[in-house]
Amino acid sequence: MSYKCQLCGKGSVTGGSYSHSHRNTKRTFRPNLQKQKVVLEGKTQTAYVCTKCIKSGFTTKPVK
């Protein structure tokens, strides 16, 4: 499974890690994913969702 948000599709991005002497090293920036129970297509499923989707209210939590 790829490291992506299952709601918005946000994934890993490559970039550079620069030191004080301006040496460059490749690295990956990964989204802050949280495992949450979410209602998807009428069913309760466990999904990996980024914190931006959680804060903005894109997720609908299942009724207990």
Curated annotation (Swiss-Prot):
Family stated for the protein in its record: Belongs to the bacterial ribosomal protein bL28 family.
Lineage: Bacteria, Pseudomonadati, Elusimicrobiota, Elusimicrobia, Elusimicrobiales
Protein encoded by which gene: rpmB
A single MF term (Gene Ontology): structural constituent of ribosome
Superkingdom: Bacteria
Name under which the protein is recorded: Large ribosomal subunit protein bL28
GO CC aspect terms: ribonucleoprotein complex; ribosome
One GO term (biological process): translation
Keyword Ribosomal protein among record annotations: yes
PANTHER family attached to this UniProt entry: 50S RIBOSOMAL PROTEIN L28 (PTHR39080), LARGE RIBOSOMAL SUBUNIT PROTEIN BL28A (PTHR39080:SF1)
